Curated annotation (Swiss-Prot):
Encoding gene, per UniProt annotation: argS
Subcellular location: Cytoplasm
InterPro entries, per the entry: aa-tRNA-synth_I_CS, Arg-tRNA-ligase, Arg-tRNA-synth_N, Arg-tRNA-synth_N_sf, ArgRS_core, DALR_anticod-bd, Rossmann-like_a/b/a_fold, tRNAsynth_Ia_anticodon-bd
'HIGH' region (motif): residue ranges: 132-142
Chief localisation class: cytoplasm
Transmembrane residue ranges: none
Subunit structure, as described in the record: Monomer.
UniProt xrefs under PANTHER family: ARGININE--TRNA LIGASE, CYTOPLASMIC, ARGINYL-TRNA SYNTHETASE
Any one GO cellular component localisation term in the record: cytoplasm
GO molecular function terms noted in the UniProt entry: arginine-tRNA ligase activity; ATP binding
Name of the protein described by the UniProt record: Arginine--tRNA ligase
Family membership noted in the UniProt record: Belongs to the class-I aminoacyl-tRNA synthetase family.
SUPFAM superfamilies listed in its UniProt record: Anticodon-binding domain of a subclass of class I aminoacyl-tRNA synthetases, Arginyl-tRNA synthetase (ArgRS), N-terminal 'additional' domain, Nucleotidylyl transferase
EC assignment: 6.1.1.19
Amino acid sequence: MNLINTIKDCIVERLHVLNAKKLIILDDVILSKLVVDYPNNHDYGDLYTNAALILSKYVKKDPLDVAEILLRELSNIKEISNISVVKPGFINFNLSLYVWYEVISSINMLKEDFANVNIGNGRKVNIEFVSANPTGPMHIGHARGAIFGDVLANLLTKVGYQVVREYYINDAGTQIDVLVESVYLRYKEAAGQDIVIGSGLYPGLYLKEIGQLLYEKYGTDLLEMNSAQKMKIIRDISLKHLLDLIKQDLVLLGIKHDVFTSEAELLRNNVVEKCVKLLEDKKLIYYGVLDQPKGTENNNWQPRKQMLFKSTDFGDDVDRALQKVDGSWTYFASDIAYHFDKISRGFQHMILELGSDHIGYVKRLKAAVKALSDNTATIDIKLHNIVNFLNNGVQVKMSKRSGEFLTIKDVIEEVGIDVVRFIMLTRKSDAVLDFDFVKVVEQSKNNPIFYVQYAHARVCSLMRNAPNILKIEDTDFSVLSSKEEILLIKLLAKWSNVIELSAKTAEPHRITFYLIEVAETFHMLWGYGNKDVNRRFIIDDDINLTSARIYLARAVAYVISSGLKIFSIVPLEEMK
């Protein structure tokens, strides 16, 4: 049940009546611009519409005059109790109380299905997230993007999409060569040789385990093998071992990908060449000289002809190089090929989660997808910013290359998986997030996950102690008349809209914000009962009022439970 859509349908029906009377002009283009939404300020009413503003441009009248025409017709909508016009032409209206009371009934009858909306209609969507380089275990810094991608996948599944979770294994390129060389040193160390870890290599102690595994399996044989043979063995074993570690960390976070795609395998299968051939056939490849990149020292750059992709034809800032000086493919060429592979697998809609340091990839990848699909496929690139990990306000540092970093296992053992999954979504993904190990386990209103869970647990406690109540169809909800009760009901009515908007924008943090607001509003209402016995949820001598308030509380629990399950968090029935 989406109240906005319901009221919007009523308004559209009335606009068609006015159109039939030749009082306005109406067509699909105009209707596509129609907005019905909640105002930012409650003083403006329950909902507003821009109908008069958009229609005024077509009927060539002042928006306020158009609003007066609409006012007379919209006043006939039975769900609307009060309607007004404000400059420059917005129409604000309040809904009849019975509409809000029906929300309580709907939530209690539909339970966690109350906010089910089908905007995906079974369409396939590919969400690629994490894709950490397999050069070491994941550290807790990777958790933000991982949780974002997984919760987004849950959300899109809920609204009717067929979701595939994908991990791109960057198992080709320079960083893998560095990994192999680093592991070989650890193997030599396991074989009893003295080693010196040079600059630029991975010094992490986690590589000692791989070196020991190689020594236990091959003894000193690798020392005698030719370089190509031993490096292949080291590469294969190292990548498998490290990818297994990454998968174990993902399991700790409650995440399981459906597909793992190897960059090296794409290269072996000549997918880059096939992709370049396709772009050549589209006349989107040429040889040219790029301008010197900004910030590049003169002695480090020389102009030269390169194979270039006409990405500026599709909104990019500059055309992009596809080949290096030595003839090997650039990273971007591999990225294009990977997305060509996704499109070839039938994905017309893709979502890619990247760290904010990859912001320069946004335009070029969007351009590539447009070019490869003839503008039929789309890619939505969501950037996540860094997480500042704090211990009572003091920053905790981590670095893969230094060999010392905070592991996902460390954090989950300390605060729990539910805390990690919720806190990682308490800010918009592209904003910096502070994660304080002390504050996230506090049992106070300053800890959002505690406050939300506490609201759910309070309702469960209320239900355990509640007397027998009236059937919902026999309950008169008009007794819920206080300002705070109506405010909570109106907030619960927004749940469907929050789900739909979060899915359409690929912004699951909106759900976090909403659940926190629901919890705060419920706790505030509960607090009034501590000061005034007549404001409590259970009134011994009034079975109808008790029933109405319990159904309201139960609606809160259903909404919170539904939201937490999108995060794969178990709603608590009692706090420990």
